[in-house]
């Protein structure tokens, strides 16, 4: 007679999954908002739209962390990639003026390492807490044979809300408007295939002091900055005409996504200093300047476009919220079919 088999024999440990859920409940609980009905663990999560909204529009976004995860595996650093995951989605929906309401995550692996997964999801909860977004559920998929031992993949899903009349579309952007840039916290979650290639080729001392007491390793793995609370504070007092979250495609490919077709963002490359991480990447990788601008954020994580008469006040308010803000340039009329973001 054949030996009796269990799900664990096939590589799926239900007890480990249950332990992970218990581990993360306290972290998720700290993220809760009054709109959330019920607790973690149901088949679906319930969220009501508050009565303060007259004509609410839901804004959704989904993203991952990309190959930055390969460095997390190689360096056994798992406590901040969850922040990256949240930031990539909530910063995206923020661009349209949405206040993030809730977030769900997908964690997939070949073999569930509970302490490691706990670190990851603790980071997700931290990102949610910092952005005022409720972590209302997720999926942990243990799939033997699908991923190498010690590796996993992440996906995140965010939903926010904005009054219909306050949706930011970029349509009102015109010549003379001011382009502001909010400083990034590093490379955020984009360009890591190139970063890894540069590290592999240059073989630097990752643990030597690199910038303001940080090692190069710390600079490379630093989590994506969350812009939610400062931007929402600015939206309470000022009209923001357009925003661009600087992700894959860098500055030159993301800013045009919010511009009317007849406009160009003319950005002065001297308006901010290229952070040391990007200086090193450019030199070590012999990366051309325009390739830098279309691959990395180059120190600018969020672009905000406002009327000229509001620029000083918006810059001051964001500064009071803890952001480093640069006046990058102006919006001008487009000439022919020129690219809609010019950095020079």
Curated annotation (Swiss-Prot):
Chemical reaction(s) catalysed: 2-formamido-N(1)-(5-O-phospho-beta-D-ribosyl)acetamidine + ATP = 5-amino-1-(5-phospho-beta-D-ribosyl)imidazole + ADP + phosphate + H(+)
Top-level enzyme category: ligase
Keywords linked to the UniProt accession: ATP-binding, Cytoplasm, Ligase, Nucleotide-binding, Purine biosynthesis
The UniProt record lists the keyword Cytoplasm: yes
Highest taxon of source: Bacteria
Entry's Gene Ontology BP terms: 'de novo' IMP biosynthetic process; adenine biosynthetic process
Main location: cytoplasm
Gene3D superfamilies: PurM-like C-terminal domain (3.90.650.10), PurM-like, N-terminal domain (3.30.1330.10)
Disulfide bonds: none
GO molecular function terms attached to this record: ATP binding; phosphoribosylamine-glycine ligase activity; phosphoribosylformylglycinamidine cyclo-ligase activity
EC number: 6.3.3.1
Pathway per the UniProt entry: Purine metabolism; IMP biosynthesis via de novo pathway; 5-amino-1-(5-phospho-D-ribosyl)imidazole from N(2)-formyl-N(1)-(5-phospho-D-ribosyl)glycinamide: step 2/2
Pfam families for this protein: AIRS, AIRS_C
Coiled-coil blocks: none
Subcellular localization: Cytoplasm
GO cellular component: cytosol
UniProt cross-references to InterPro entries, sorted A to Z: PurM-like_C_dom, PurM-like_C_sf, PurM-like_N, PurM-like_N_sf, PurM_cligase
HAMAP family: AIRS
Annotated family: Belongs to the AIR synthase family.
Protein name: Phosphoribosylformylglycinamidine cyclo-ligase
Gene name of this polypeptide: purM
């Amino acid at each position: 007679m054949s030996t009796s088999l269990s799900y664990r024999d096939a590589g799926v440990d239900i007890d480990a999954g249950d332990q992970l859920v218990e581990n993360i409940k306290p972290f998720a609980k700290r993220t809760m908002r009054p709109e959330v009905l019920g607790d973690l663990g149901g088949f679906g999560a319930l969220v009501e739209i508050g009565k303060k909204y007259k004509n609410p529009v839901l804004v959704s976004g989904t993203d991952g962390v990309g190959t930055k995860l390969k460095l997390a595996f190689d360096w056994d650093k798992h406590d901040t990639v969850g922040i990256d995951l949240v930031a990539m989605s909530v910063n995206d929906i923020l661009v349209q003026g949405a206040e993030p309401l809730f977030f769900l995550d997908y964690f997939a692996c070949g073999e569930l390492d509970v302490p490691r997964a706990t670190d990851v999801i603790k980071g997700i909860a931290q990102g949610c807490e910092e952005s005022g977004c409720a972590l209302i559920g997720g999926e942990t998929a243990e799939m033997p044979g699908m991923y190498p031992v010690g590796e996993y993949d992440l996906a995140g899903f965010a939903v926010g809300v904005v009054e219909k009349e306050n949706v930011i579309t970029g349509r009102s952007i015109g010549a003379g408007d001011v382009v502001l840039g909010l400083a990034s916290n590093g490379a955020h979650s984009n360009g890591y295939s190139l970063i890894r290639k540069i590290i592999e080729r240059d073989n630097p001392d990752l643990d030597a002091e690199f910038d303001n007491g940080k090692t190069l390793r710390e600079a490379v793995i630093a989590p994506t900055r969350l812009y939610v609370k400062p931007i929402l504070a600015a939206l309470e007092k000022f009209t923001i005409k357009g925003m661009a979250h600087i992700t894959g495609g860098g500055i030159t490919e993301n800013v045009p996504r919010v511009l009317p077709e007849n406009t160009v963002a003319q950005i002065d490359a001297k308006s901010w200093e290229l952070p040391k991480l990007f200086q090193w990447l450019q030199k070590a990788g012999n990366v051309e300047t325009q390739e830098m601008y279309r691959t990395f954020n180059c120190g600018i994580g969020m672009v905000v476009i406002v009327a000229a008469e509001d620029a000083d006040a918006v810059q001051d308010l964001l500064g009071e919220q803890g952001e480093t803000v640069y006046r990058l340039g102006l919006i001008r009329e487009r000439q022919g079919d020129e690219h809609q973001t010019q950095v020079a």
